[in-house]
Amino acid sequence: MELWYTEKHTEDVKFSIRVDRELYTEQSKFQRIDILESKEFGRFFTLDGLMMVTEKDEFIYHDMIVHVPMATNPNIKKVLVIGAGDGGTIRELTRYKTIEKIDMVEIDESVVEACKKYLPKTACKLEEERVNIVYEDGLKFVRNKENDYDLIIVDSTDPFGPGEGLFTKEFYGNCYKALSEDGILVNQHESPYYEYYAKSMKDAHEKIQGLFKINKVYQAHIPTYPSGHWLFGFASKKYDPIKDLNVEAWKSLGIQTKYYNTDLHVGCFALPTYVIDMLNEDKE
């Protein structure tokens, strides 16, 4: 008997991967956690049936959510990561020796423990000495922070269930307050392609652009995410991700990446016309 993982992207579109075996399943206090193994994508991790990470393509997402802000301001010292229980974002951040402190706020400890055991490729740096893991609601955590971080990365799930509060105006306002005077906020911005995800993308962008001086959106192709076309939000009090990119400074760090490079850094902000039109709809 064949076993397949299937995720519904719309009422008329489904995405499937043949599964070799199920490694782990748990219904935590917050969500259902599954870790499966496949021939094509290696091990992969889902929450409430939705794809989070695969061993084969996780490098794309984690490269883009980390190295774009870090190349924009290589002097970042203090970082807050909200979500990111699989550890991939933390892994990439720890490659920067200049970072002094990484606070990771994850609501579900079960996710972290499962990923440590079954996804060591992403979770390999969660116990690094600069990393402080707090098991708490990210919305609640940032309420009490002011001028504490140079970079906040919102590596959240989709805007429902446990991650719903991380897409509110209150949350983004608290992130702004928690950032230093030249702070940067980066978040996963959903997909612009299917209507449901596009609405979430536009809602998040509208809330963020009312707060920050600089607001940009950039993109990557992630094969296992809905439509494959995925966006990230870049918001900053000071730094422009293109004008302030110092190519030589970043290259001098000697960080070897699999997806990100400084040419791509500039190019990923060149959006398709249909996405630009969506982002401008609320301005008209």
Swiss-Prot record:
Pfam families: Spermine_synt_N (PF17284), Spermine_synth (PF01564). It catalyses: S-adenosyl 3-(methylsulfanyl)propylamine + putrescine = S-methyl-5'-thioadenosine + spermidine + H(+). Its main location: cytoplasm. Signal peptide: none annotated. Spermidine binds at H62, D86, D155, S156, T157, D158. Homodimer or homotetramer. Coiled coil: none annotated. Residues 2-237 form the PABS domain. HAMAP family: Spermidine_synth (MF_00198). The keyword Nucleotide-binding does not apply. Catalyzes the irreversible transfer of a propylamine group from the amino donor S-adenosylmethioninamine (decarboxy-AdoMet) to putrescine (1,4-diaminobutane) to yield spermidine. It is found in: Cytoplasm. Pathway: Amine and polyamine biosynthesis; spermidine biosynthesis; spermidine from putrescine: step 1/1. PANTHER family: SPERMIDINE SYNTHASE, SPERMIDINE/SPERMINE SYNTHASE. GO terms for molecular function: spermidine synthase activity. This is Polyamine aminopropyltransferase. GO terms for biological process: spermidine biosynthetic process. It is an enzyme of class 2 (transferase). One of its GO terms (cellular component) is cytosol. It comes from the Bacteria. The active site is at D155. S-methyl-5'-thioadenosine binds at Q31, E106, D137, G138, P162.
